[in-house]
């Protein structure tokens, strides 16, 4: 009976996730087309600003663009849904004859690489420091770490990125700004080799540092609060009365239960940052999906914008869905309440 109830619950949640994605995709489709300007006008305006005569600019636009913007909006929407149902994101307006899926596959892995590494470092570091703050709460160590976590969490990531570039790059010259641009050095190809990994980490180093600094504070504070709350539970007191070693209590009784609420936040964080930060990737000129989204917005490349927004939406929605399932599996109290 309980298994059936949980199955129905997760099935309903899955349907809600699909409906949410559909609604957001529809909203995004129409919102993008309500933006001032269209790809054709922006391309011609850019050509004119570069001194190209109007007639020549129009001829270039006619040879490059293969999209009928004169179609009724509803017809374009129906065509979009038909293509989406087949898994076809369409063809980029700006990158002539280039499938959007090919563009996504080219840029998305670099963002996923940065996101995975940075969230792993910040989550593990934040959890460990949060537990340490809870154990030594009200001490000078707790006060210093709490102050650091509060300050660093309040600073926007793009501000930290600009400070790193201006102060450490331009003023102190700790790194060459021009050399670190992009996701790989010229001539380096993706392959399973130490040289490739070193080069990839070198170019991703600054975005990773920014993401770690702007997320670790939240993990520290949430884990500290959750650990303090868990330390006051009856089962922890019973474990102490039974003479169980302090290390075992902290790992098996406190740590395991205190970390559960953080899994929801972790899943949501993964979903949100899959799209990358357009500002961060633009500041460091890191060739991820966020930088590509910025370029697509500027040029009004509708198919690319739609695909990236859809990926971000799906990531956030299904991250929430998976977090809900994960909590149900790991926490017996949630399974009991849902049944």
Where are these regions (language model features)?
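Flexible, glycine-biased helix-capping/connector loops in cytosolic signal-transduction modules
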Residues: 38, 85-87, 276, 332
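Hydrophobic secretory-pathway targeting helix
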Residues: 2-29
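Hydrophobic alpha-helical transmembrane segments of multi-pass integral membrane proteins
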Residues: 22-27, 73, 77, 116-120, ...
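An internal, D/E-rich "acidic patch" concept
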Residues: 2-6, 68-127
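Membrane-water interface segments at the C-terminal ends of transmembrane alpha-helices
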Residues: 27-34, 79-82, 148-179, 210-212
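Alpha-helical transmembrane segments of integral membrane proteins
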Residues: 4-7, 108-141, 157, 170, ...
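Hydrophobic alpha-helical transmembrane segments of membrane transport/permease proteins
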Residues: 21-75, 172-195
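Short, motif-level signal for alpha-helix interfacial/capping segments enriched in acidic residues
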Residues: 14-18, 32, 133-135, 302
